[in-house]
From Swiss-Prot:
Lineage: Eukaryota, Metazoa, Chordata, Craniata, Vertebrata
One Pfam family cited in the UniProt record for this chain: Med27
Species name: Xenopus tropicalis (Western clawed frog)
Name the UniProt record assigns to this protein: Mediator of RNA polymerase II transcription subunit 27
Gene giving rise to this polypeptide: med27
Nucleus listed as a keyword: yes
Subcellular location: Nucleus
Tree of life domain: Eukaryota
Length: 311
């Protein structure tokens, strides 16, 4: 029966074609490895380029040779005879194999996604309930008398407590200077000077950080009337990048029940930029990439990465 099914097929050529396919894949892999590694260390630029071109040409010749050999063997394999149909066994390929159907993995992924969605929805609901605002004065009606009184939240903290928290954080980091002001009432604004590297304007609402603007050490952070400029961006792209990362850090450090811990964690993360222009990237080992230093700091380890290397 096996001999009858093999009529018209050159099994030896078929076996050689399989080995040739493996050799072709290896040759193509060597081509991409050559492109990935680039020019190797040589005495001169010309020698590096000459060695790279020579190696690349050799790898392309190997690919061309294996491809020609595969085309030659494909003509020798032949076609199976059609005089021996597979009958009902030919329908086996139409039925899905239950062991290879990714139904369980897809259901498990959907279940995890549903649980995560429910968890984050609960967190968002709790945060929105804590920071709820009165949208209209018409709420002071008959129904308002039946509503229970709103419990005080962490948004209503005394200014003395906020000053004490900021003062303790200022003493924690000698290379960081924090100036606190309240130009618009009870809301605090911080001017954080990190060594001679950068300055950060932090807009706060009680102990919650609403906005951060990072500028260079020599840039002007005040408006014409002497107030902190909370709207103008930095003139330098590197500090614009750090501003974007600081905004991401505000979304990462979220603990409404302990806002002082959030502020301290954010200041600890911000302090890691003291070596903004001195620390190399932990992945590529370079100081500059596209003309910029490593502007990203890991939230857990505080290690420096380029924006493209952290992914």
């Amino acid at each position: 029966m096996a001999d009858a099914l093999n009529v018209g097929v050159n099994l030896e050529a078929f076996s050689q074609a399989i080995h040739c396919i493996q050799a072709l894949r290896s040759s193509v892999t060597r081509v991409f490895d050559c492109l990935k590694d680039g020019m190797k260390n040589k005495e001169s630029q010309e020698a590096r380029e000459r060695a790279f071109v020579s190696e690349f040409q050799d790898n392309l010749h190997c690919v061309n040779r294996d491809l020609n050999e595969l085309e030659r063997l494909s003509n020798l394999v032949g076609k199976p005879s059609e005089n021996h149909p597979l009958h009902n066994s030919g329908l086996l390929s139409l039925d899905p194999v239950h062991d290879k159907t990714p139904l369980y993995s897809q259901l498990l992924q959907a279940y995890k996604w549903s649980n995560k969605l429910q968890f984050h929805a609960g967190l968002a609901s709790g945060l929105l309930n804590q920071q709820s605002l009165k949208r209209s004065a018409n709420q002071m009606g008959v129904s308002a008398k039946r509503r229970p009184k709103v419990q005080p939240t962490t948004l209503a903290l005394p200014p003395q407590y906020i000053d004490d928290v900021i003062s303790r954080i200022d003493r924690m980091f000698p290379e960081m200077t924090i100036q606190l002001s309240r130009p618009n009432g009870s809301s605090a604004m911080l001017l954080v000077t990190l060594g001679k590297v950068l300055k950060v304007i932090v807009v706060m609402r009680s102990l919650f950080i609403d906005r951060t603007i990072v500028k260079g050490y020599n840039e002007n952070v005040y408006t014409e009337d002497g107030k902190l400029d909370i709207w103008s961006k930095s003139n330098y792209q590197v500090f614009q990048k750090v501003t974007d990362h600081a905004t991401t850090a505000l979304l990462h450090y979220q603990l409404p029940q302990m806002p002082d811990v959030v502020v301290r964690s954010f200041m600890t993360w911000l302090r890691s930029y003291i070596k903004l222009f001195q620390a190399p990237c932990q992945r590529c080992g370079k100081f500059l990439q596209d003309g910029l230093p490593p502007t990203w700091r890991d939230f857990r380890t505080l290690e420096a990465f380029h924006d493209s290397c952290r992914q």
